[in-house]
Amino acid sequence: MEHNERREFIKMSALAFAGIAIQLNSISTFAQHANLFQGRTINQGLNWDAFLSKITQLAKEQYQPNWDQNSYIKNVQNLLQQCQFPEFENVKKEFASYENKNKDWFEHALLHKEINFQVSLLQFEKGEYISHHNHPDMCGVINMVTGNALVKNYSLHKELEKTKTQSYNGQTYTLISCVLEETKKEILTPGKTSILTSTKGNIHSLMPNEFTQLVDVFTPSYNEKNEAASIWYQVNEEVNFENKSKLFEAEYALS
C-alpha cells in the first residue's frame, strides 16, 4: 500500500461517506474451518509449511496461457480455510507483539513474499478501515481470523468524461469521474473469505466494526508496477448512478 499522499487525499475526501452506520453481527466463537482441498477431513488442518508449499505450486500456474484464475482463487480459498492461523508460530509472534503504531490506519505484517504471491496479516482497531481501491492485474483472497468487517467489491463499469481539480496538502490533483458496479457486499466473520480477481470485483473496501485480524493472499505479489498503477476511489454510495441498481459514481485522483 504505497503512494501515501494520494491515498490520504482520497481517504480524507471519503470521510463524508465513512459516517454511514453499519450493523454487523457480534461474534462469540470461531467458525469451523472448511476442509475441502484434496479430500481432507475436518480435523486435518494444514501447517504453515504445507500451506506455503501448496500455494507455491498453484501460483506457478499463473504464467500458463490457459491459466484458470477462478479455479486458482477457489483453491486458495480452500487452503486458507484449512489453516488455524492463531496456532502458527509466526502468527502467534505477530499477535503477541502487536502495537497500534499507525493512528487511523491498520498494522501490516508481511508473513511471506515471493514474486508469484504474498501472504500478509492485517490488524485493525475499531474505526480503522480501508477505503475503495483496486489491485491492477492481481487477484486476491481475504480470510477473516478474528473480528468482523463489511467488505464491498466493485468492478469498473465505465469512465465518464468529467473531471475537476482540487488541492490538498499543497498539491493539485485532477479528479476523474467514473461509474463502478457493485459485485458483492458481505459481512466477513471468522473463517469466512472474500475474493477478487483481475477482472471482477477488483476494487474493494473493508470496514471492521471491532478489533479485527485477517490474512490475505495476493497473486502476484505487490511490486513497483502494480503499486504505481493502484487507484484509490471516492465512491458516492448514497445515490445510484442514473437510478440503476448496483451502479455508483466515483472519483479518483491523478496528481
Identify the role of each PLM range.
Residues 203, 207-255:
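Double-stranded beta-helix
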